[in-house]
Amino acid sequence: MVVELKNIEKIYENGFHALKGVDLELKKGDILGVIGYSGAGKSTLIRLINCLERPSSGEVLVNGVNLLQLKPKELQKARQKIGMIFQHFNLLSAKNVFENVAFALEIAQWEKNKIKSRVHELLELVGLEDKMHFYPKQLSGGQKQRVAIARSLANYPNLLLCDEATSALDSKTTHSILTLLRDIQKKLDLSVVFITHEIEVVKELCNQMCVISNGKIVERGLVEEIFANPKHAVTKELIGIKNEHADKKSQNVYRIVFLGEHLDEPIISNLIRRFKIDVSIISGNIEELTTKDIGYLVVRFLGSIAETQRALEYLNALGLQVEKLKD
């Protein structure tokens, strides 16, 4: 495991209980989206991973090492394998792009003759070779975040922490940054933890997700599995799933989930032909995820109880997830 958090508790001096019994694992090569509403404990969680915050109790293991047991110099060395980017970039305004990236190498005591080539390599990676002499005030928000990404990768980390890294960006720039992160993750075989309150970020970037609410992890798993079958009320809210009805008198209303391989199949028309049943479509949409697409249909079955039951058994036999909505 690249990251293991074991039974983490975090209680601040004012008595606020930010994290409660948190257990979390991150495997090599995974991109984990940690999502929740403001105040849920997301930023506290990510700052514990590199010990910018220390837990009240529990264990923090990164690359198999318990960071809480390290001496200051040992912790500083361990942090070199953990990159981090922030919402507001945290660039040094008095230094240009080259110097901002080089600063991380200087702190790590790189030899001067190696710093120049490494900075050029990093700026090429993030597409800013032509901006190395620019200062932060001359850059757009997306360019500033690219500098921050380059700086975070300076010391060849195998873990990248992203704390609301796209929250200050518009949607077009967010997409370009997420595309860059996805490409870099593949190229460098990074493990990534991305804190966000935006479900679109999870959909576009992550293969794993965890939902945090009131200091607890309430749901954790593959992105497509959670989107297909969310369990917790907060997860359903974040994904945007509602109990949809045509009216209060509606009966036999179901939500059907179609995973990628079923999206192009005429399942509903086949069902109508096969059984003595009509199907009224109330709503539908498709979620485009990193790993696969997922389709949702909310429908009402119009037919006898026996034929409706046969239709449901048919859908289940195809491997579709079917949920009856409340009458």
From Swiss-Prot:
<dbReference type="GO" id="GO:0016887">
    <property type="term" value="F:ATP hydrolysis activity"/>
</dbReference>
<comment type="similarity">
    <text>Belongs to the ABC transporter superfamily. Methionine importer (TC 3.A.1.24) family.</text>
</comment>
<feature type="binding site">
    <location>
        <begin position="36"/>
        <end position="43"/>
    </location>
    <ligand>
        <name>ATP</name>
    </ligand>
</feature>
<dbReference type="GO" id="GO:0033232">
    <property type="term" value="F:ABC-type D-methionine transporter activity"/>
</dbReference>
<comment type="function">
    <text>Part of the ABC transporter complex MetNIQ involved in methionine import. Responsible for energy coupling to the transport system.</text>
</comment>
<keyword id="KW-0547">Nucleotide-binding</keyword>
<dbReference type="InterPro" id="IPR027417">
    <property type="entry name" value="P-loop_NTPase"/>
</dbReference>
<keyword id="KW-0029">Amino-acid transport</keyword>
<dbReference type="InterPro" id="IPR003593">
    <property type="entry name" value="AAA+_ATPase"/>
</dbReference>
<dbReference type="InterPro" id="IPR050086">
    <property type="entry name" value="MetN_ABC_transporter-like"/>
</dbReference>
<dbReference type="InterPro" id="IPR045865">
    <property type="entry name" value="ACT-like_dom_sf"/>
</dbReference>
<dbReference type="InterPro" id="IPR041701">
    <property type="entry name" value="MetN_ABC"/>
</dbReference>
<dbReference type="Pfam" id="PF09383">
    <property type="entry name" value="NIL"/>
</dbReference>
<dbReference type="InterPro" id="IPR018449">
    <property type="entry name" value="NIL_domain"/>
</dbReference>
<keyword id="KW-1003">Cell membrane</keyword>
<dbReference type="InterPro" id="IPR017871">
    <property type="entry name" value="ABC_transporter-like_CS"/>
</dbReference>
<feature type="domain" description="ABC transporter">
    <location>
        <begin position="3"/>
        <end position="239"/>
    </location>
</feature>
<dbReference type="Pfam" id="PF00005">
    <property type="entry name" value="ABC_tran"/>
</dbReference>
<keyword id="KW-0067">ATP-binding</keyword>
<keyword id="KW-1278">Translocase</keyword>
<protein>
    <recommendedName>
        <fullName>Methionine import ATP-binding protein MetN</fullName>
        <ecNumber>7.4.2.11</ecNumber>
    </recommendedName>
</protein>
<keyword id="KW-0472">Membrane</keyword>
<dbReference type="InterPro" id="IPR003439">
    <property type="entry name" value="ABC_transporter-like_ATP-bd"/>
</dbReference>
<keyword id="KW-0997">Cell inner membrane</keyword>
<dbReference type="GO" id="GO:0005886">
    <property type="term" value="C:plasma membrane"/>
</dbReference>
<dbReference type="GO" id="GO:0005524">
    <property type="term" value="F:ATP binding"/>
</dbReference>
<keyword id="KW-0813">Transport</keyword>
<comment type="subunit">
    <text>The complex is composed of two ATP-binding proteins (MetN), two transmembrane proteins (MetI) and a solute-binding protein (MetQ).</text>
</comment>
